[in-house]
């Protein structure tokens, strides 16, 4: 029996509607299955979530000594938390970092900091660099003795005698690229980088000349890091300046 034209059109529309509904349900089912498969294949762990960090900072946060991105593995958790917080609050400026942490809670920043603080991959050998003897000597002086005439305390006075940092919030400065060190000390000197007040690093950086900054960075970048080097215990050093980023010990 042949359908009249209006009835045929209605039948076609009903068939088309049913087909589209069936197709949509099928596609939804496939998408759900794919999502379940992806969820099963990628475990929801802190390590997996932090691939956004290790993409730049390297596996476990180890970085390298010949790139711009710093090593964050093994740094004191308090220091790492302070830096993440500073990026979120605008005291440090780097668009990619700000984008990553802009909407993260304090608790999650602390979780990230704790994860990387607990990573201890080996350090690479120092990067090749050949400063002049005068530059090397000036860097050695500033790191280990400071410059009383310019009211510059020795780096070891805050960062520890082995320059491996002090718990809970002072970082070690060895194993970092020279260019990174120059850029960060320079950022404090020109006001682009800030820490919690009183900002002791800003005070020190203001007293350093460009040549001083280059000398310190060259000396630090040339030092090997001993296996098992870690930040020393709280209270191991008496700070020569008040630092808002370092909690006072009772």
Language model features by range: what are they?
Residues 66-70, 98-101, 168-170:
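Short, recurring structural edge motifs at helix starts
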Residues 76-98, 175-186, 190-199:
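Extended intrinsically disordered, low-complexity coil regions enriched in Ser, Thr, Gly, Ala
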Residues 30-36:
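Sec/Tat signal peptide C-region and signal peptidase I cleavage site
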Residues 71-74, 103, 172-175, 207:
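Short, conserved sequence motifs enriched in acidic/basic residues, glycine, and aromatics
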Residues 1-14:
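N-terminal secretory signal peptides that target proteins for export/translocation
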Residues 37-50, 59, 92-164, 190-250:
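Flexible coil segments in periplasmic/lumen-exposed cytochrome c-class electron-transfer proteins
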Residues 41-90, 94:
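The feature marks the first
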Residues 18-29:
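Bacterial N-terminal signal peptides
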